[in-house]
Amino acid sequence: MKIRRIVSTIAIALSVFTFAHAQSFENVENNAKVFSLHLGATRMIYKPNSSGETLAVINEHNYPILVQANVLSEDQKNIAPFIITPPLFRLDALQSSRLRIVKTEGAFPIDRESLQWICVKAIPPKYEDKWAKEEVSGKKSDKATMNIQVSVSSCIKLFVRPADVKGQPDDVAGKIKWQKVGNKLKGVNPTPFYMDIAELRVGEKEITETHYIAPFSSYEYPMPVNGGGDVRWKVVTDYGGISKTFETGLNI
């Protein structure tokens, strides 16, 4: 009898706890949002002797955001010798603006392209932010709020193309040589352009890793199991489109 009373008491306590716990979650408002910007291009070609290039930035959210932009080195670990103006600014809801990118210093090779990255980050407003106070005021809730906000940096390739490098990547993309090295497919790029591989197949097998191949360099892709036959590939063009299909035999 004593054991039965103890069990009953525990059951009642658990019921009260579960009810209170559920009630507490009813008063919690969950907000999970991903914040990003839409950029007006997927890549940019920069002529070293130019006065600069511009890039459109669009805020597709229905509230203002802060836009933070910079140019990074190829490995995205260091600041590149460029300035972006403005580097930090408010962009109102459903509005667009333009960034100006200008080379400041630094010597780039004159016989090949160099790769940098333009990275633009969207910083969303918080209730206490004075710069967005008029948009978020009056939006407090009686409920507790659990906010999960993820700011995403949008990065596009910035190709520094010297005057001595003529034409476009898709003009010479057919010169890439392919060979089987162990369980890898090695692509050799004998051109001064970055070859941004958009699609790659060995026979009927697709290689999903579409990493670029730097100028006068090579890159090894994972070879498909039982892959064999001709290699077919496409590259990304200067305007962000996809080139025609190139095809060649596989050197073993």
UniProtKB/Swiss-Prot annotation:
SUPFAM superfamilies: PapD-like, Periplasmic chaperone C-domain. The keyword Signal applies. Keywords: Chaperone, Fimbrium biogenesis, Immunoglobulin domain, Periplasm, Plasmid, Signal. The keyword Cell cycle does not apply. One of its GO terms (cellular component) is outer membrane-bounded periplasmic space. Residues 1-22 form the signal peptide. Pfam families: PapD_C (PF02753), PapD_N (PF00345). It is found in: Periplasm. GO terms for biological process: cell wall organization; chaperone-mediated protein folding. Involved in the biogenesis of the AAF/I fimbriae. PANTHER family: CHAPERONE PROTEIN CAF1M, PILUS ASSEMBLY CHAPERONE. Belongs to the periplasmic pilus chaperone family. This is Chaperone protein AggD. The gene is aggD.
